[in-house]
Amino acid sequence: MILLAVVAFLFALIGAGFIVRRLRGHARRYGKDLPQRFHMGHIPRLGGLAMFASMVLTVGAAGLQNWWGYYSNALHWNTWVLYFFIAMLPAVAGGIAEDMTQRMTVRYRLVLTLATGLLAVYLLGMTVPRLGLGWLDALLSAAPWLGMALAVLAIAGLPHAFNIIDGYNGLASMVTVLMLF
């Protein structure tokens, strides 16, 4: 798994480097008066594309490891992995479209992340079965659809919450990593 983490880092580094170097021309269309433009030069806003491509390539590398017989317990290809990527597609496509056009409304992006949440619940069985409070756990047990609704709300809401926090300087990534551990 350490090797896969290193491979994922390298894929992300190479992908982000490629995007920054090769797609500068696209970044010229971003208005210079926007509050996000505090850096010098033209920097494209397609980091999500590099991260998604890194995930796909890393899972592919893990599949090759298994196929070649190395580290057979690293990651097993199954329908869950395929469903995971299918569930992510609406949110990823919306993020890339927003980065490319800067014309998507927040409502439309929220609909796409809600679609991702619904797909995650449907395809992956994501739910919130318990919260650690007896009375609330009893309610979630009696009405499992509430746990599904909470999962959809979390999947749809967290990216927007972190985007609001992140806003201008990109410092929310470390806060996100610490919170989700």
Language-model features, listed with the residues they occupy:
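"…together with the soluble PPM/PP2C metallo-phosphatase catalytic core" -> "…together
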Residues: M1-F181
